[in-house]
Amino acid sequence: MDVHAQTTSPSARRPRRLVTLGGLTLAGALALAACSSTSSSPATTKASSSPSTTGAASATAKILTPPSSTVALTETGSTLLYPLFNLWGPVYSKQYPNITLTTAGTGSGTGISQAAAGAIDIGASDAYLSSSQVSAHPGLLNIPLAISAQMINYNLPGVSGHLKLDPTVIARIYEGKITAWNDAAIAKLNPGVTLPATRIVPLHRIDGSCDTFLFSQYLSKGDPADWGANNFGTSISFPPISSALGATGNGGMVSECAKTVGCIAYIGISFEAQTQKNHLGEAMVANGSGNYVLPDNATIDAEAAGFTKSTPANGAISMIYGKTAAQGYPIINYEYAIVNAKQSSSTTAQAIRAFLSWAINAAGGNAPSFLSQVGFRPLPPSVVSQSQAQLQSVQ
């Protein structure tokens, strides 16, 4: 694929079948802070079809066996992970009818706090634990489950293909320094494209979210001199701009952008089906090598590969705006299970170890039949092994 092409249609670019869950909100506690989010209804899963493992690479870690007794596992947290857990649960329960999984999308911050309190078995988070959280809860683990990405979308009728945007231009937009789509800075990145004089409407999250963390960290790493090297977080004070709008959750970002001509927004990739349904454009964004890329299987994998060797044993690492992958997509992250190493019973501990060992395995939950539905990518084999090693601490 020519990453500089301007005429590829969004629907033709990636043949992925994505889960559409309207109204889900993404919130998280990323390295510096915890977030809150609107709750999604709990779902208890019991039955579905078995996964296809065609084309899945063999994982180095084995899938563990759950206990023979009945165990009801509970999961809550990241609404970006919520669709994936809802795919995983029924299949796992079909294979092991004595194990059930009740899921809820309440935001990563809730997932972390509930796991820390021992109120649930598995917390789902779009981010690793902060140093303060680790200090407060030394037995809490963040276990990588899969890899996700964030899109930059816009509502610009009549403009086909994918506009190119870099972190400097995006930062200027959110600072109110670039106010029209035909601004010279945008035109320079998109020669030959007829840009309208439409007013730009920067859309941002008004709830604390990992999307805001990822987005603002991309700007801080790509434009440190102007945006600010430390101007990132789950909740930041965006510059006051008269045209700017706020929305809650990824679902809110999609719907608000869809009804606002001129909008630009940052949206989690598991909502790609909704962005396409609402005819939102998707930008090719500049990576650390200066190339413009879209988030697809190849570019997400390429970016992740640049961080594989540096991923620590506990999986806590930022993968934003790397400089080693020429065709890597620059806004990606690990998705995490937050689990207490010390469980209330050995039976529960065994069930957690078994389920999560299945979830991270290419012959189980990391199979394309699951991940492709939400736009996620599988863990590299070495990270699978690291996650498996962390699971052994759950007792």
Residue ranges and their predicted role:
Residues 2-4, 13, 36-38, 44-395:
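Flexible loop/hinge segments at secondary-structure junctions
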Residues 29-34:
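C-terminal motif of bacterial Sec signal peptides marking the signal peptidase cleavage site
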Residues 4-25:
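Bacterial N-terminal signal peptides that target proteins for export
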Residues 20-24, 40, 380:
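Generic alpha-helix initiation/capping and coil-helix boundary signal
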